Amino acid sequence: MIFVISAFRFLSCALVLVSAAATAATGTTGAKPGSAPAPLFVLNSLDDTVSVIDVTTWKETRRIATGKQPHHLYLTPDEKSVIVANALSDSLTFIDPRTAEVQRTVRGVLDPYHLRFSPDMKWFVTAANRLNHIDIFRWDGSNMTLAKRIATGKTPSHLWIDSKSSTVYSTMQDSDELIALDLPTQTIKWRVKTGPMPADLMGTADDKRILVALTGGDAVEVYDVSGPAVTRSKVIKTGLGAHAFRALGDGRHVLVSNRVANTVSKIDLQTLDVVGRLDVPGGPDCMDVTRDGKHLYVSSRWARKLSVVDLTSGKLVRQVKVGKSPHGVWTLDHAPR
């Protein structure tokens, strides 16, 4: 039974790599220019480890032991810790994003598959992919207290919180739904049917649209959430296994990984059209973009490698061997989201 649960998890990934809340609140986009490069973190879900990579030498400098099945990670609002969610050990590992030293482990957080802070920095939210609920925690700047556990649907996968910290959106991977939670009242506002196996999702800057990647299909669905009725306004064909999003950092484009097609599509958020494609082998999954916008880091899930793509030439420039089933990818030296 554990094998079956794990297999379902490997169909989900999020673009969880950095806190949009921290960026909005502090005005920062990672380490300061001129400082030593921050390490690059790659979560190895089947090794229960995090690979730490020196981006000046492209060597793995160490491998951090975490809890069971780390999938996603997220920066705290004060940027002092990056939190690794260990789904099968019900724990969170806090790591210094600059030194890669483990700071502490928080236990008793049930099945934290995906995680996110609200932009107002008051709430910390986790999706329990295996246990079919979403937990909402109060965040006091260093610790979390459970405020509400909300039963959702089958396999809540990824999370997105709007810029006003009023609505939490989540995909239901195995019931093919998009749901919205009212954060002030901590109740479900609505749910709509989606295409097959919705995974990652993201909102537009004006909070009017939600993009949903269909891992069981070959497209990104666009939902208009600005009015009283939620409508699917467009379907953007990207590639088989559309999975995770990463904003390019230019305020206009977003990337989506297509895990089965072994490609990454570039979407223009103004026209909602695909305007480019990158070839990335090995089942591209989670992504991060360097602060200068020149390179894309991609976890190649089935190849046990980190792939590095030159965004100017569109070419794969290197692959770095990491652990089993690499998933979340993140660095403090990231481009804006």
Explain the meaning of each model-derived region.
Residues 17, 21-337:
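Predominantly soluble domains enriched in secretory-pathway, periplasmic, or organellar proteins
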Residues 11, 15-17:
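Leucine-biased recognition of intrinsically disordered, low-complexity hydrophobic segments
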Residues 1-11:
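Bacterial N-terminal signal peptides that target proteins for export
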